[in-house]
């Protein structure tokens, strides 16, 4: 059983990246074949594959632009347009090379495999590349962020929602929101909180009036980092 997690880079220090890495780690710890595939970056995209958090050594990482370069038709179609996105903070052009790679990935999957999409762009590209043919693998799209404010992401997800098997929220309050806004069956909605691990933070409490050679006690504190998405407008 293989789990593919499509990501828009794993270099940033934010909740989305940490959630993606922790999800990959959790599957790898269970002995599954896990592959993080990056969708952004130029040339090889390698600059977006330096994780700021611990990544399980068995998790494979690749950029989609650098996969299957041994297939002649993949190399020859790098200058043929396939997909473009022009959002305020996300602009990218994807050649037909990406289409061939996504088709190749689909051809290698079975009913026991899963794909997790962390951004609706990845979902739409996968659907278009495979000509709307239902994937053999289970398709899961995760909701990260505020989709009422990120209207472009909302629109992409809305037109591709029927292609996925499950829509995963990271907050149980979002289940009814998703059902209401996208009119999808409740059995396709899954609440799975972000997989998080405690981070040990050391805090030194010092008294500035004590002598320099006096021992200072160290207190250990633990903090959990996670994110909660919503499609509710912010107040």
Question: Where in this protein do the model-derived segments appear?
Answer:
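An aromatic- and histidine-rich active-site surface loop
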Residues: 95-102, 115-134, 149
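N-terminal strand-loop element at the rim of the active site
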Residues: 7-13, 26, 32-92
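Nucleotide-sugar donor phosphate/pyrophosphate-binding loop at the beta->alpha transition
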Residues: 96-101, 138-163
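A short beta-strand/loop micro-motif in the catalytic core of glycosyltransferases
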Residues: 115-116, 163-172
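Conserved donor-binding/catalytic core segment of Leloir-type glycosyltransferases
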Residues: 168, 215-235
């Amino acid at each position: 059983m293989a789990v593919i997690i499509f990501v828009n880079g794993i270099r940033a220090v934010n909740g989305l990246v940490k959630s993606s890495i922790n999800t990959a780690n959790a599957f790898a710890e269970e002995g599954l074949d896990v592959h993080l595939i990056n969708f952004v970056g130029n040339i090889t995209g390698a600059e977006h594959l330096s994780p700021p958090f611990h990544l399980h050594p068995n998790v494979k990482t690749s950029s989609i632009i650098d996969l299957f370069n041994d297939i002649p038709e993949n190399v020859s179609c790098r200058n043929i347009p396939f997909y473009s996105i022009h959002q305020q903070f996300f602009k990218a052009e994807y050649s037909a090379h990406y289409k061939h790679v996504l088709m190749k990935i689909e051809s290698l999957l079975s009913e026991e495999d899963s794909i997790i999409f962390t951004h609706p762009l990845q979902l739409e590209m996968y659907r278009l590349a495979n000509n709307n043919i239902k994937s053999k693998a289970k398709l899961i799209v995760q909701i990260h962020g505020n989709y009422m404010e990120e209207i472009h992401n909302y629109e992409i997800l809305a037109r591709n929602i029927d292609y996925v098997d499950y829509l995963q929220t990271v907050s149980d309050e979002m289940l009814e929101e998703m059902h209401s806004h996208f009119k999808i069956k409740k059995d396709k909605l899954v609440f799975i909180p972000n997989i998080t691990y405690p981070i040990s933070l050391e805090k030194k409490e010092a008294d500035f009036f004590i002598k320099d050679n006096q021992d200072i006690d160290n207190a250990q504190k633990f903090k959990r980092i996670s994110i909660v998405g919503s499609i509710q407008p912010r107040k």
